[in-house]
């Protein structure tokens, strides 16, 4: 097991469709968050927070987080929280 959860490799952890759907949710969610923050703090640059979200997504995908957990929402939380936090940190740094 990995941190008490079911370990799985790329062949047994969910389907490709589930993973693609998860990535779609994350990408859309990251954009919604960064656009919302930007609209609240115009002329806060949208690209800065989106960049943070996508870099986080790319990094975690590269680390293959999606292949280690067999729980859809857990994957969503693991990938989503760092994106939101990075977005907020950049927002605070720019202010």
UniProtKB/Swiss-Prot annotation:
It comes from the Viruses. Keywords: Early protein. This is Probable protein E5. The gene is E5.
């Amino acid at each position: 097991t990995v941190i008490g959860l079911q370990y799985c490799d790329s062949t047994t952890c969910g389907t490709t469709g589930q993973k693609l759907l998860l990535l779609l949710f994350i990408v859309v969610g990251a954009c919604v968050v960064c656009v919302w923050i930007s609209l609240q703090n115009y002329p806060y640059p949208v690209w800065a927070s989106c960049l943070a979200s996508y870099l986080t997504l790319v990094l975690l995908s590269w680390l293959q987080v999606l292949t280690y957990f067999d729980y859809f929402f857990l994957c969503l939380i693991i990938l989503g929280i760092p994106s939101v936090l990075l977005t907020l940190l950049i927002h605070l740094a720019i202010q």
